Amino acid sequence: MMINMNIEEQVEKWLLDEDLLREMKYDENADFHFIVEFPKENIMDVVKPKDKDSIIIACATQVAPQHINLMQSSDMKTQKEFILDLNFGLNQFLVDFELQVNNNILQQFVVTEQIFEDGLTKDMLIRTLKRVFKAKLHCIWLIDKKFGSLPAPSNENDMFI
């Protein structure tokens, strides 16, 4: 647990120990806001909101235009089933999520999870980063399953902006 260190110092140390910390961002609504890379080439945020006894792990993903086009070219039944399947699937990860949907087409999604101070350990932080990432991966895989994928991109991250 955290002995003789404040939360910011402890979380920063854990992230540095695992080579995950990429930058510290100024955020007027937070006591600290770290940008982390977990896993490689995936950016996430670790934030402690002001006056809260918890930290938030968040991962926001913008759906690439070519995938939006694939969704738009499908029928409405498929579009609605996809959004429903996405909600059911994400709910099983026990994370919070927000889907930005316009006319049954997913535009972007944000997956978040909260860890309260009394449960904050290095193990819990890393496990939560993994769970948030796996929930994001679920969204990506479900898009591929429902709408088909494009020819293999040169870089896996080309799929989502």
Question: What is each stretch, according to the model?
Answer:
Residues 91-131:
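Charged, low-complexity intrinsically disordered regions
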Residues 144-161:
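Short, highly charged C-terminal tails/helix-capping segments
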Residues 43-72:
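Short, well-structured hydrophobic secondary-structure segments
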Residues 134:
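Long, contiguous binding/interaction regions
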Residues 61-108:
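Short, internal acidic amphipathic alpha-helical interface segments
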Residues 36-41, 58-65, 113-117:
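Secondary-structure transition/turn motif
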Residues 1-54:
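Charge-rich, low-complexity N-terminal segments
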